Amino acid sequence: MAQTHGSKQQAQRLEQGAESLRHGAQAQSRENNVSLSTVSHADEPSQRDESSRLTVRMENTYQLGPTKPFPVATVNHILEDVLTTYLQEAQYDPEFCRQMTKTISEVIKTQVKELVIPRYKLIVIVYIGQRDDQSIVIGSRCLWNPKSDTVSSYTFKNSTFFALANVYAVYFE
């Protein structure tokens, strides 16, 4: 219960930060609206530093498959809800989109973790790009077990940009 409360507080902090970013980005006007926005895991140091991580050794359960399947439909609903909530009224701004990719991916990860699906590793990737009569192809390749591993995906579009969110769920044996 305390963990759920903590993750809800984290989600609220992220939403407040996103709201301030949304208003700040809309207040700015840029002369050149065509630009490139990139985000990498190396852009900013992690909130957790390596020394604070505890090494946990778990005994082997000899369980080769999940006890219940990954709830793809529920995660798809989370993706749709989060992307629509955060981006419905937004306009494309490179700095705003850069921050929103981080915020949205953290919110999605927090909400999916609240489903408490045991023994699944989660990877959340969010892409946001400008819609300016161009084409883009986004692909991913994964080596996994199709019986237990899966992906959920949702695409959001408005008049100035598109957003794609993917959640990869890989069963940890």
From Swiss-Prot:
**Sequence segments annotated as region (Disordered):** 1-54
Source domain of life is Eukaryota
Q: Which Pfam families match?
A: Tctex-1
Q: Where is the composition biased (Polar residues)?
A: 1-13, 26-40
The Basic and acidic residues compositionally biased stretches are 41-52
Q: Which CDD domains match?
A: DLC-like_TCTEX1D1
Record note on quaternary structure: Interacts with ZMYND10.
The family note in this entry says: Belongs to the dynein light chain Tctex-type family.
Q: This protein is called what?
A: Dynein light chain Tctex-type 5
Q: What is the lineage of its organism?
A: Eukaryota, Metazoa, Chordata, Craniata, Vertebrata
Gene symbol of the encoding locus: Dynlt5
